[in-house]
């Protein structure tokens, strides 16, 4: 039986096949308790010994998904408000076939630039997930301020402005590209 890395939490069927496993060996590993089948093409490594993250599982159920909104804000340390669901953005023409019981996902459909701008691939050990960069997260929070909440939006923007690694030029560029410039200007005038 082949050796599965204990540093990688989830494998797709394609990844297992690319490292030399056959469908028969995959089924054998499931029966032996080495892998646990989450859905038709995603397997969980039972002997995983790294950090746990809901984001790994979210990507398993939404492969084109990008961590966004409050989940991204918490990831960057911009908010103390912990969301009860993982916020995931997907392209408008894609669907999430099966929503898992855990982690609960809040799926948001984005179109065009709102989806494609600012995607960053995060790698932790052998695990990968996509998340929007901090400036794109700020613009999305401002755009969805009525759903996120005005107080949370204010807290996130204040925390961003207090960071030494903030990039106001990039923030302004994203605001222009995503038609959120007027909202950003209003919030900055109030806070500064």
Question: What positions do the PLM features span?
Answer:
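Nucleic-acid-binding surface
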Residues: 5-18, 25, 30-32, 38, ...
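Amphipathic, charged-and-aliphatic alpha-helical interface segments
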Residues: 1-3
């Amino acid at each position: 039986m082949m050796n599965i890395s204990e540093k990688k939490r989830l494998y797709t069927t394609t990844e297992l096949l690319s490292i030399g496993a056959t469908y028969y060996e995959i089924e054998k590993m499931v029966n032996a308790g080495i892998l646990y089948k989450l859905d038709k093409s995603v397997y969980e490594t039972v002997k995983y010994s790294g950090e746990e993250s809901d984001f790994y599982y979210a990507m398993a159920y939404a492969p084109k998904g990008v961590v966004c909104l409050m989940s991204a804000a918490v990831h960057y340390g911009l908010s103390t408000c912990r969301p009860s669901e993982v916020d995931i953005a997907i392209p408008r023409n894609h669907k999430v076939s099966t929503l898992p019981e855990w982690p609960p996902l809040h799926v948001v459909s984005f179109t065009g630039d709102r989806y494609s701008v600012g995607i960053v691939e995060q790698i932790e050990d052998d695990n990968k997930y996509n998340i929007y960069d901090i400036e794109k997260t700020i613009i999305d929070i401002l755009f969805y301020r009525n759903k996120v909440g005005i107080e949370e939006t204010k807290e996130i923007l204040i925390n961003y402005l207090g960071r030494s690694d903030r990039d106001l030029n990039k923030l302004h560029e994203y605001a222009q590209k995503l038609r959120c410039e007027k909202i950003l200007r209003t919030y900055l005038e109030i806070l500064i």
